[in-house]
Amino acid sequence: MKKLMLLEIGVLLVILIALIIGAIGFAKPAMAPAELDVPADTAGSTNADSQARQEQTQQTTTQPPEPTWMTFPEDRALKAQQYFVYDCDTDEFLTISGTQDERIYPASITKLFTAFVAMQYIEPETQITAGDVLDLVAWGSSVAELEKGDVMTAEKLVEAMLLPSGNDAAYLLAEQAGRAMTNQEVDAQTAVALFMEEMNEQAERLGMTGTHFVNPDGIHEDTHYTTFADLVQLGKLAIENESVMKYASVPKETVQLQAGSVLWENTNALIDPQNKYYCPYAVGLKTGQTPMAGSCLLSAFQKDGKTWLIGVFGCPEIEDRFEDTLQLFTQSLAGE
């Protein structure tokens, strides 16, 4: 009887063990679907890993900060004697001192129109040799350090006008274009005179009726003048001119001349990322300075598909033209 009871207990234990093993085997597949929902690259990840991934996603989707530039107190007085802000999209002056037909002296801003006219008669890759025309350059004026015998392409001479504001480059282009107009080897002075006639005729045809040019570089003459209305027209022409805009925003470049390497630095500080006056929305154009014109600047700005032209003239110091321009640009954005 005792053996029978032990046998029954043994059978019950075997059945119980079998049931337990079966239950375990049956429960395992229920875990598989949950495991399949976990991506392979996150298997075994922790809450810390998940938080790190969320932070990384937020960082990659965050927009970069808005570019900044030098700003000034609202009550800062402009130093320029004459100035304007022009909206090229609405074709209107947003700010202007005096009237749009008031006569002003453009100084080296003249070189924008010199480039515009000259490159109509000269191919960009035309090789030009500096010669006697350099004798016509005013002593002590800004130059690109060109000497007689230097050879440079016409396009490179445009750069020489726009970066270091080379009056020597302006005369070389004027001479070359003047000769191309007549297809004759006239002397340097005659060639430049012919070019100046063409500059004035083109200004007239373009509606720049308040403008008269005497020389290709902007050295002061009482009869060398323009107006705000005509400068707007000039600025628009410059923005659309490939030869001008190719170099208008180049901060500096080292070039090789006969005398050795020369560094050309752009006189427009607004386009130089290393300069404290740098503005990421400034795209060019040209500075100027004479005793009568003061320190001046015609600038183009582009932001969010819009274009502005800003001119400041008669500034007492070189720095004033950049500070006034930035102040006017900031105020224009705030007024939108």
Residue ranges of model-derived segments:
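Penicillin-recognizing serine hydrolase domain
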Residues: L7-I9, K28-V38, T68-Q82, G178-E336
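N-terminal Sec-pathway targeting helices
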Residues: M1-V14
